[in-house]
Amino acid sequence: MDKKSAALYKKMQAEIESYQNLQKSCLKMVKQRAVLESQLNENKCVLDELNLLGPDNKVYKLFGPVLVKQELEESRQNVGKRIEYISKELKSSTDALENMEKDMLKHRESVAKYQQQCQVAAAMQ
């Protein structure tokens, strides 16, 4: 293998490594997104249940091992804020995932280009 082929091979290996790292990050992001979606659904169900309650119903919040009485409206507001926060995090993770996918596509194209160049260099020898 001459110097040019070795350099091309090294560049291709670096691109492959970058691509694999992006794949790992993407997988982590997908898992994180699944957790967020689960939390969002759970909180929406809680809010639906809270909306079914009347003013005479009592709501308790768990603080460590103790149940503490909480106002119904305060509970609704807290759950609503949690839903907003989780929704923002979900949007942020979706945007990050889209950017990672674009980067992965660029790296995939670079790897293909380097593979082609390596094949051409090998054929010339």
From Swiss-Prot:
One of its GO terms (molecular function) is unfolded protein binding. SUPFAM superfamilies: Prefoldin. Pfam families: Prefoldin_2 (PF01920). GO terms for biological process: chaperone-mediated protein complex assembly; protein folding. The keyword Chaperone applies. GO terms for cellular component: cytoplasm; prefoldin complex. Heterohexamer of two PFD-alpha type and four PFD-beta type subunits. Binds specifically to cytosolic chaperonin (c-CPN) and transfers target proteins to it. Binds to nascent polypeptide chain and promotes folding in an environment in which there are many competing pathways for nonnative proteins. Belongs to the prefoldin subunit beta family. This is Probable prefoldin subunit 6. The lineage of its organism: Eukaryota, Metazoa, Ecdysozoa, Arthropoda, Hexapoda.
